[in-house]
Structure formats: C-alpha cells, structure tokens
Design a protein with these regions (language model features):
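Short glycine-rich phosphate-binding loop at a beta-alpha junction
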Residues: 65-74, 162-170
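Long, contiguous secondary-structure blocks with strong helical propensity
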Residues: 19-23, 30-33, 69-71, 88-90
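N-terminal phosphate-binding loop and adjacent alpha-helix
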Residues: 41-57
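Oxyanion-binding and handling regions
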Residues: 1-29, 44-47, 103-228
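Phosphate/pyrophosphate-binding loops at sites that engage ATP/ADP/AMP, CoA/4′-phosphopantetheine
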Residues: 53-69
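DPxDG-like acidic metal-binding loop motif
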Residues: 69-100, 107
C-alpha cells in the first residue's frame, strides 16, 4: 500500500528539525503550510539543538505534546548533527506516542528542487556535496527535475561539462570543485517543496555507502545482453 503523503491539515503543527548544515535549523509548520516559528542556531549541534527547539516552540506558543508530526532532514550532511537530531526526535516521540509520525527529506534533493523551482528550464546540471576524499554525494538535474541522490567521484566531476553547483558541509574533506557555484542551504524554503516529504516508520538517516558500488555515470544505460 502506498504511503500517505504529508498533509498540512492532519500532520500539523509539525516540528521541523535539520542538523545537516553548518547551523541547526528548527521550525514549526502550521496548517496553512507557513511557518509559525523559525529558529536557527550557529555553533556545535549539541549546544545548538535544544535552544533552537525551545525558541521555536516558545514563538509558536506550543509545547512538544501539541506537535502532530516530526519532519527531519535525513542527510546527507553533518553526521553528528543528523544523529543528534534523530536521537532527540526519537526521545520526544516516546513522550507523546500518539504524535509519533515521522516525515523525512533529503538535503540534496531539497536544494536541487529549489534550483529547479527558481529556474524551471534547468538541464544538464549537477549538484554535489562533500562525502569523503575523492567521493561526492550528487544529484543530476535534467529537464527541470532532479534525479536520484547518488555518489560520483573526482573523475566524473572533472569531466562534467554542464553547470556545477556545490552545497557546503559543516566539515569538508576536500575543496569545492573548480568552477562550481556555491549554494546557500535553505531549509526555510521547505514549505515550497513539501512533496519531497516521505513518511517513515522510524527516524532513518541517509547512508551514502549504499550507493558506493552503484555510482552514477554520465553514460546512457545500455541494455544487458546474455548468450543463451
């Protein structure tokens, strides 16, 4: 059975938590798909998350028991920030089990979708973020639509002839690719792309490792032939 999409009528107010970037972002989303409150804290995730949540709930005049769902960034991004946010959400949802609805979004998919929203004719573009030395998380954009989140290596980036975007991470293992346009991560624009939200049974984080052995390449897929 297909998972139910996010509904602003039944799943709000929703607490949005994003620890993937250089700062911790927290927001409270209301029924009109607009922010009731936003709080963004710089500094280490351990020191920033709870003050950001407290500030957002205070501005929205809500308590955790009144939250209908948790929306979180699954990554890729700061491993420490993502894990800390995941543990916090799991703890809070146990306090209010009837409200334990989880919706996830991918940081690269969010950024790629915003590129397409701002420039609907975007094509032959590549968005990358640092994963580890010699490897990058990447989303290819074609026909104004983002593809899947995959892993590419330095060679693919060096040979890329289209427009290249780079999404900075809290801690990078390598310098941004030459000729890449640096993006500002914008989780505050999430209400513009709520279709990205995926229902989860539990708080699950994105793992780049599952794509290592199926790296995306710019070549067209060729049909596999076998000798019978």
């Amino acid at each position: 059975m297909q998972a139910k999409p996010f509904s602003a009528d039944s799943n709000t107010p929703a607490l949005v938590i994003d620890g993937s970037g250089s700062s911790v972002f927290v927001g409270v989303l209301g029924q009109d798909q607009c922010w009731l409150a936003i709080s963004q804290q710089d500094g280490a995730p351990l020191e920033s998350l709870f003050p950001a949540v407290e500030a957002a709930l205070k501005t929205a005049q809500l308590s955790l028991t009144e939250i209908c769902s948790f929306i979180y960034c699954e990554g890729p991004g700061s491993v420490l920030g993502l894990r800390l946010c995941a543990m916090a959400i799991e703890t809070w949802s146990r306090l209010t089990p009837t409200s334990a609805h989880y919706f996830a979004y991918n940081s690269l998919q969010l950024s790629a979708s915003l590129i397409c929203l701002d420039a609907p004719s975007s094509t032959d573009e590549l968005l990358v973020s640092d994963w580890k030395k010699g490897a990058w998380n990447a989303v290819k954009i074609n026909g104004g639509a983002p593809g899947s989140t995959d892993v590419v290596d330095d060679e693919i980036i060096a040979n890329w002839t289209g427009r290249l975007f780079h999404l900075p991470q809290r801690k990078g293992w390598q310098k941004p690719p030459p000729n890449a346009s640096t993006l500002t991560y914008s989780p505050q624009r999430l209400p513009e792309v709520l279709h990205l939200l995926a229902l989860r049974d539990s708080v699950e984080l994105y793992s780049s490792g599952i794509n290592v052995f199926q790296k995306w390449t710019p070549e067209r897929h060729r049909a596999v032939t076998t000798n019978l």
